[in-house]
């Protein structure tokens, strides 16, 4: 696992086994410092069931899986949602996960998140931690956060990537001001990746039906 992560950061590229195309892992992939923070959040929360929106080149998924393995629960499972894996990314994210030996830990969904998340909710799935790095338009991020808030156990952690983007920060702001979520931590701000760790509400939603706070 660690050797695959170290190689990815050292080489910065990967050759797709599917079609031989060469892919630059960065800046699409998260930084080493964000990866470490993500892994530590998984460990700190003792997460067992995790979910990620946007597999991409798999750098974040590798760190999440590293955290799950460190937690040592045999029921650990990481769901990755990415409808573009076999097109834009040449299946490189899944390839790196296979090379790291964690394929059995990972469940890949090739549907768009706005389709997959309601289906998971309908089927009764539940998760302990989520990482959001998919569609960065406001409506996409908003839907991801709202559905994840229902899919995660109360008081769980959602880590949103690219918090520096207005669409992401505004969607997060709605959840903080209207849903009782708490901003637990943010990473160092830069123009490529800026993450925010959010804790969902712990109690029942007791808002009146007309409730709304400007965000």
Language model features with spans:
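S-adenosylmethionine/decaboxylated-SAM
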Residues: 24, 28-215
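Rossmann-like AdoMet
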Residues: 1-30, 44
